[in-house]
């Protein structure tokens, strides 16, 4: 029986979670809370500038959405504690507004009747942060009720950082994410708390911060203090990459590194980590649902133990599919 999902915040991630859930018989979205009216939500769900038209029938019935004949209840409540998740049968809430990332705030969904909350962002004071393929085995149904799915960039970096550490020992590393612009930037020059994100997103390469590298230690404690990095926001609407330069404990060749990553991609991390030896560009990964896809042609080794690994990720589709995978995993392990 499919686990019942409620989505709070029907933006880029919320809608992509919905799209991913439509293709998964083990999860069912039954309710959405967003301050936008149902007609606009239906329009933005059906037509997407990045991912194309949704292959589903989407209509509005009063204040609700009907997708492929199934009714999804729509509400517009600002206070999560006042939602009707319990009455609607919602078991897991995907908290994707970007506003309720503190545990105390996200836990209001539990007051409203949900059994678990997945925050689709890095969080604070969460019960656990999980990156699928890396540490989902740490989930404890009795004690973990507010769960962070980390960031899209941590979901890209952590799987291959784990492989490098397990195989060769990762002494330290610096990463840069070359990241498509997101809604936390201005489309034209306008005020923002980050002076650089205040500049026109589609006209500039914008250096900014990311907590993704340090956050890896939340799912791989053995790498605490060993990774750091930053971000370059670039004028593309979707698909990003992580460029990791790391010092290993062992001396390796390019072939050693690529073989280890390929083995993981075809084995334990299949469906999470991809591996490509084709000369591809960002647009080729639009719609790719892996968390991370190694660009094997870009792997480099210098002086035996310094390596450079580049991995691509669709920062919308890949991440949203992991949110759905996590919901399915939680339901299987116990609510």
UniProtKB/Swiss-Prot annotation:
Free-text function comment from the UniProt entry: Catalyzes the oxidative phosphorylation of glyceraldehyde 3-phosphate (G3P) to 1,3-bisphosphoglycerate (BPG) using the cofactor NAD. The first reaction step involves the formation of a hemiacetal intermediate between G3P and a cysteine residue, and this hemiacetal intermediate is then oxidized to a thioester, with concomitant reduction of NAD to NADH. The reduced NADH is then exchanged with the second NAD, and the thioester is attacked by a nucleophilic inorganic phosphate to produce BPG.
Pathway(s) annotated for this protein in UniProt: Carbohydrate degradation; glycolysis; pyruvate from D-glyceraldehyde 3-phosphate: step 1/5
GO cellular component: cytoplasm
Keyword Cytoplasm: yes
UniProt: NAD(+) binding residues: 12-13, 34, 78, 120, 183, 315
Catalysed reactions, as listed in the record: D-glyceraldehyde 3-phosphate + phosphate + NAD(+) = (2R)-3-phospho-glyceroyl phosphate + NADH + H(+)
Major localisation: cytoplasm
Enzyme class: oxidoreductase
Gene Ontology biological-process entries: glucose metabolic process; glycolytic process
Quaternary structure note: Homotetramer.
Family: Belongs to the glyceraldehyde-3-phosphate dehydrogenase family.
The name this protein goes by in its record: Glyceraldehyde-3-phosphate dehydrogenase
Catalytic residues as annotated in Swiss-Prot or TrEMBL: 152 (nucleophile)
EC number: 1.2.1.12
Chain positions of site Activates thiol group during catalysis: 179
Localisation per UniProt entry: Cytoplasm
Keyword DNA damage: no
Recorded name of the encoding gene: gap
GO molecular function terms noted in the UniProt entry: glyceraldehyde-3-phosphate dehydrogenase (NAD+) (phosphorylating) activity; NAD binding; NADP binding
Alphabetical list of PANTHER family matching this protein: GLYCERALDEHYDE-3-PHOSPHATE DEHYDROGENASE 2
Highest taxon of the lineage: Bacteria
Annotated Pfam families: Gp_dh_C, Gp_dh_N
SMART domains: Gp_dh_N
């Amino acid at each position: 029986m499919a686990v019942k999902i409620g989505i709070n915040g029907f933006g880029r991630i919320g809608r992509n979670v919905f799209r991913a859930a439509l293709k998964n018989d083990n999860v069912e979205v039954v309710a959405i809370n967003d301050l936008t009216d149902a007609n606009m939500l239906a329009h933005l769900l059906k037509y997407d500038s990045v991912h194309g038209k949704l292959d589903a029938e989407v209509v509005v019935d009063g204040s609700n959405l009907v997708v492929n004949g199934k009714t999804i209840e729509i509400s517009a409540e600002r206070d999560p504690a006042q939602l009707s998740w319990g009455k609607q049968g919602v078991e897991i809430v995907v908290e994707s507004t970007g506003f309720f990332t503190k545990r105390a705030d996200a836990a209001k969904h539990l007051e409203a009747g949900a059994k678990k909350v997945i925050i689709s962002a890095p969080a604070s004071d969460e019960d656990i942060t999980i990156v699928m393929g890396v540490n989902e085995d740490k989930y404890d149904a009795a004690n973990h009720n507010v769960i962070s799915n980390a960031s899209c960039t941590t979901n890209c970096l952590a799987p291959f950082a784990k492989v490098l550490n397990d195989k060769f020992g990762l002494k330290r590393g610096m990463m840069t994410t070359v990241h498509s612009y997101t809604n936390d930037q201005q489309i034209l020059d306008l005020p923002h708390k980050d002076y650089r994100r205040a500049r026109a997103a589609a006209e500039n390469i914008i250096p900014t911060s990311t907590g993704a590298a340090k956050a890896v230690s939340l799912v791989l404690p053995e790498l605490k203090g060993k990774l750091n990095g930053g971000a370059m926001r670039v004028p593309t609407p979707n698909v990003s990459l992580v460029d990791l330069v790391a010092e290993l404990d062992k001396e390796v060749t390019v072939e050693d590194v690529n073989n280890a990553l390929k083995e993981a991609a075809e084995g334990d991390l299949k469906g999470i980590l991809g591996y490509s030896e084709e000369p591809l560009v960002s647009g080729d990964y639009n719609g790719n649902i892996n968390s991370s896809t190694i660009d094997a042609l870009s792997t480099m080794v210098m002086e035996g133990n310094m390596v450079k690994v580049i991995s691509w990720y669709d920062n919308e589709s890949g991440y949203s599919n992991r949110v759905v995978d996590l919901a399915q995993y939680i339901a299987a392990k116990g609510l």
